[in-house]
Amino acid sequence: MTHVEIKKVRDEPSSDDGVRLLVDRLWPRGVSKADAELDGHPKDVAPSTDLRKWFDHDPKKFQEFGDRYRAELDDNDAAHDLAAKLRDERPQQVTLLYGAKDEEHNHAIVLRDWLRDHL
């Protein structure tokens, strides 16, 4: 079974990370591609620009943001393709990398939970 975890993209890469995927639509400032040590950047699974701007990292909006983002993921072919790829390849560990400062209210949490439900 594939374990899906999240981690800040600025945190030190680890051999325990397994497959490292940057799940932000935009490349995080100050992070080089070499330092990120990515296996992929499926930016099409990130929240839409409109949803990201509406949320604006406001913890008070996180519950509704999560509901809206899950609805986007349910209708997103790229998200279903990613889940199918992970089911087929069966990596032991996948680490979703994000650039947000808030570790408790960010889209990677929602995506992690959605992927866990779809693997």
Regions found by a protein language model. Give the residues of each.
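Residues lining hydrophobic/aromatic ligand-binding pockets adjacent to catalytic sites
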Residues: M1-L119
